[in-house]
């Protein structure tokens, strides 16, 4: 059975489109399309540094809109996790969310999986290192599952959402699903730490039924 949010179509946006792996600078940000997965983007802000430290805009609606990310965010979240914590792969079923995620302390490997019905990249995943050092952000449109694993001793993770959290609307996929095949960069000997809920999510194969 198809989950309702899968009817979010992978349509062409009227806003500026960015070709696969092409970079474009708009205002104070650089946006890179993630391979051939339409709508999935890595955002890099301009950092102004001097002897005192640095300053950067982490979000500016006008700059993002010019770069093709015209989203109204309504909720900001922040989590703290220790090394080896893996959260995901999560989505909301009837209230799907656009997300803009970044790391303010530490380092994570962040993953998005395309679950949009009709998408040419349905079931394909993309991962990116987000860290306090590289200051990259990951824009994940509606219709994706999302998760991350912490690679540093600790990590502070923040994200903006285009819809509110609905606890009764949670969906998920098991993190190590063989059909999706996410290549988590987990060093040998590092223990993974998952919540009981994240250990029990279903498979991609069941999700498609």
Label the predicted regions.
Residues 8-11:
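Short hydrophobic alpha-helical segments enriched in small aliphatic residues
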Residues 18-133, 152-154, 161-209:
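Non-catalytic, conserved peripheral segments adjacent to functional cores
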Residues 130-152:
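Conserved metal-binding segment of the jelly-roll/cupin
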